[in-house]
Regions:
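C-terminal lobe and adjacent flexible extensions of AdoMet/dcAdoMet transferase-like proteins
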Residues: 216-247
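A short glycine-rich, Lys/Arg-flanked "PGG" loop and its adjoining helix->strand segment in the class I
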Residues: 133-145
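Class I SAM-dependent methyltransferase SAM/SAH-binding core
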Residues: 59, 64-108
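Conserved class I S-adenosyl-L-methionine
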Residues: 1-56
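Conserved beta-strand signature within the Rossmann-like core of class I S-adenosyl-L-methionine
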Residues: 146-153
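A short acidic, Gly/Pro-enriched loop at the edge of an enzyme's catalytic core
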Residues: 110-118
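SAM-dependent methyltransferase
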Residues: 153-218
Length: 247
């Protein structure tokens, strides 16, 4: 059975546009409600500035904005996702003045001054082992001393390849927006999955697109060792979340 998570890669831009119409529907049915509950206490005391890695369409951006008065740097490489995010900001003049949208990936982010916090929700799996060391270096360079790195994470058993299964179906007017997925290959910490996005009318598919993506799920011990090697210290966080600080 395929895991239900945000699957996005910093190197996939317009190819991921096929998922944009399904994005909020699927993620509101997935990890986003839990993150809304778990993230706010981890941002307590943050007042000046936050980087959000992989802002997507802005679902978590709004959570950050509600819980802190800080300026937000929303990093999003996908043009399709970024377009929805900017349109969402345009609906609220207060957010439009606080959120700077950066059209780049996590490895290329640079902001004007060190920030108090970096938030990264369902993005870490996009980075293979050979890129994560650079990721930690880049993020550490953006944080002020004592700054916090917050992300969601949990241990996972290696999935078994299988058949395509419907993971969610959502009514939009008289249409059903359907997301299906299957694991194609799993080895070590890498899992290659296929996702199919269909729009159905009276049960008949009138639109169908697919994306194949490889995600990377290191063991918790390895992840902790990488972060410590990059100079981070672990801080307390609820189950399902991680918080690490620079000394």
């Amino acid at each position: 059975m395929i895991e239900h998570d945000h699957v996005k890669d910093d190197h996939i831009k317009d190819d991921y546009a096929v998922a944009v119409p399904f994005y909020d529907l699927w993620h509101e049915d997935g990890h986003v409600p839990l993150v809304r509950e778990l993230l706010p206490p981890l941002l307590k005391g943050v007042e000046r500035s936050v980087i959000e890695i992989g802002a997507g369409t802005g679902l978590i951006t709004r959570v950050i904005a509600q819980e802190t008065p800080a300026r937000i740097y929303a990093v999003e490489p996908s043009l399709g996702m970024r377009s929805v995010l900017v349109n969402r900001l345009a609906e609220d003049p207060r957010l439009l003045g606080r959120v700077t949208v950066l059209p780049c990936g996590a490895l290329d982010v640079e902001v004007d001054e060190p920030v108090e916090a970096i938030v990264m929700i369902s993005v870490l799996q996009s980075f293979p082992a050979e890129q994560r060391a650079e990721l930690w270096r880049v993020l550490a360079r953006q944080l002020q001393p004592g700054g916090r790195l917050v992300f969601n994470w949990r241990e996972r058993a290696l999935p078994v390849p299988g058949d395509l299964e419907v993971m969610g179906s959502y009514a939009v007017g008289r249409h059903a927006y359907e997301v299906a997925g299957q694991v194609l290959e799993a080895a070590g910490e890498s899992v290659t999955s296929r996702f199919v996005y269909r729009i159905r009318q009276r049960g008949v598919a009138i639109s169908e697109d697919e994306v194949v993506v490889t995600n990377h799920w290191p063991a918790g011990e390895r992840l902790a060792a990488e972060l410590r090697a990059a100079g981070f210290d672990r801080d307390a966080a609820p189950e399902g979340m991680e918080m690490w600080r620079l000394p």
